Amino acid sequence: MNQKDTRKETLEFNKLQKRLRRNVGNAITDYNMIEEGDVVMACISGGKDSFAMLDILLNLQKAAPIKFEVVAVNLDQKQPGFPEHILPEYFETLNIPYYIVDKDTYSVVKEKVPEGKTTCGLCSRLRRGTLYSFAEKIGATKLALGHHMDDIVETMFLNMFHGSRLKAMPPKLRSDDGRNVVIRPLTYCREKDLIKYAEHKDFPIIPCNLCGSQENLQRQAIKAMLIDWDKKTPGRVEAIFKSIQNVSPSQLADRELFDFVNLPLDRDGSREEYEFSEAVVSSTNIDESLFIDVTNI
């Protein structure tokens, strides 16, 4: 690569980095994800998204107007072939506090899920429960997950097509028991940007299919659909995401969100005070010159 190409590549990466940092900063501000004194537990799986999230959070931490801590946590689920040395070595180079949590959820999943079925759903639930418990143990006030805009839109369509529910992933969520708050700092970030960012940063990425399970085929189909839309109509994924931010319950059909039963008219006077006028036009007095001869069309 010549000097001109190197300069161009550096310029493009700088633009990408600024865009991602700006998107993360805006998401944090819009949803009040991180507050003064927070201990943010960054959940690192070893994939491109969580690596990028950690990298961006650490950079924003240096310039943020508030003080907060970032603690990296990886859950070692004892999958066969998982390179246990990679993440500790990486965290050491960053000189940040970190924990490796050993929890053999792999054996549980293999025992519960029939052969040939995807294990991702149960694996995810077990992982979430373990991380919730560990967050309390270390005093973390926020759990940061690496889901991005594409994940959120994909999840919405998954729930629509296969669950008949208009539901996605919220940027910020309080757990059902009220004991943890989950944040998704990459909410405004596109996956294609994160792929480029990870490639340039050369993160030590660990594949997520060490367990032998394949990604849910339904999600694969939706991901392919969004990629196709993105090629044919750039900006469509962003537009769909914005629609999630601009919901009009009265224009949908959920009776729990909007009271369609009690819709009184805002009019003065009683119904008896109104009079009906005669119809202006009836079927017997229409001007026949207005008709169009369509026999030869």
From Swiss-Prot:
One of its GO terms (biological process) is tRNA thio-modification. It is found in: Cytoplasm. One of its GO terms (cellular component) is cytoplasm. Binds 1 [4Fe-4S] cluster per subunit. The cluster is chelated by three Cys residues, the fourth Fe has a free coordination site that may bind a sulfur atom transferred from the persulfide of IscS. Keywords: 4Fe-4S, ATP-binding, Cytoplasm, Iron, Iron-sulfur, Magnesium, Metal-binding, Nucleotide-binding, RNA-binding, Transferase, tRNA processing, tRNA-binding. The keyword Transmembrane does not apply. It catalyses: cytidine(32) in tRNA + S-sulfanyl-L-cysteinyl-[cysteine desulfurase] + AH2 + ATP = 2-thiocytidine(32) in tRNA + L-cysteinyl-[cysteine desulfurase] + A + AMP + diphosphate + H(+). Pathway: tRNA modification. A motif (PP-loop motif) lies at residues 45-50. [4Fe-4S] cluster binds at residues 120, 123, 211. Its EC number is 2.8.1.-. Its main location: cytoplasm. Its cofactor is Mg(2+); [4Fe-4S] cluster. Belongs to the TtcA family. The thiolation reaction likely consists of two steps: a first activation step by ATP to form an adenylated intermediate of the target base of tRNA, and a second nucleophilic substitution step of the sulfur (S) atom supplied by the hydrosulfide attached to the Fe-S cluster. HAMAP family: TtcA (MF_01850). This is tRNA-cytidine(32) 2-sulfurtransferase. It comes from Vibrio parahaemolyticus serotype O3:K6 (strain RIMD 2210633). The gene is ttcA.
